Amino acid sequence: MKKLLKISAISAALLSAPMMANADVLASVKPLGFIVSSIADGVTGTQVLVPAGASPHDYNLKLSDIQKVKSADLVVWIGEDIDSFLDKPISQIERKKVITIADLADVKPLLSKAHHEHFHEDGDHDHDHKHEHKHDHKHDHDHDHDHKHEHKHDHEHHDHDHHEGLTTNWHVWYSPAISKIVAQKVADKLTAQFPDKKALIAQNLSDFNRTLAEQSEKITAQLANVKDKGFYVFHDAYGYFNDAYGLKQTGYFTINPLVAPGAKTLAHIKEEIDEHKVNCLFAEPQFTPKVIESLAKNTKVNVGQLDPIGDKVTLGKNSYATFLQSTADSYMECLAK
């Protein structure tokens, strides 16, 4: 009953929310906002839905978020597999105002599989964050592609199953190649909406591609001396970055950052730390897992921090390159010890 009331409230908000003046481009998560703001600079504003300090893995929409979706000039999201909190609102706005990255034909060949083989499912997860709620709803949506489809969700432990069941690594903002495609798509959409700013948008796109190429070259050189050093990350978010810049990830603690690994998994990780001479364990600012502190204490391995959302990076024209550089610096700070 509560679920039905929540869905009704969201639907009502979508139907009744007033159109706002000076609507912006809305990105589901901040790293997408870095790409968007680089292209939209001087054209229109950029907003991010998931606020600083929050994680898209467990985010719940507020009514004000629904209004932002409805009033935006353009919404950029990854897709319902990872941005599931946006599925309903996205289905109720015009598809020409939406970029669904998962649906972009040029992106699909570049997607990587989630590295489930590095996470050992032993059935003993530590459910400190337990989510028991059911979804049983149908919806039609038609966003950024030419067909409608209908699907039904009826499952428990949504965050756990939804993220751990994914076969694709959807942290696509860490792929420079995919980010270039997204930037081009944003430029195309903004040019259609703001034809008088066509030249500025084209220049922003050119600057984005040039800056990204220059920054990538610097990062590759910076990380060359630590490319053979093994490390564990808190959750499997960095595969695209590691592949792009030649880093050697030994493994990760969990697929879903809301679910801590169990005792058997931790015992196996400890063995791998010793066997592979792992140099670093990386935590994340959005989560403070005690398992990393415990392993570091018992193994004497270094501990660093990676921020897959880029909370400390400010949106702006060069923010995507700054975000990648910030990640590289965080790697170096620990791996170079």
Curated annotation (Swiss-Prot):
Q: Which Gene3D superfamilies match?
A: Nitrogenase molybdenum iron protein domain
Q: Kindly list the places in or outside the cell where this protein is found, as annotated in its UniProt entry.
A: Periplasm
Annotated S-S bridges:
280-334
Per the record, where are the segments of Basic and acidic residues compositional bias? 119-129
Which residue stretches belong to region Disordered? Answer: 119-163
Relate the protein's function as given in its record. Answer: Part of the ATP-binding cassette (ABC) transport system ZnuABC involved in zinc import. Binds zinc with high affinity and specificity and delivers it to the membrane permease for translocation into the cytoplasm.
- What is the name of the protein in this document? High-affinity zinc uptake system protein ZnuA
> Taxonomy-wise, where does this protein's organism fall, top ranks first?
Bacteria, Pseudomonadati, Pseudomonadota, Gammaproteobacteria, Pasteurellales
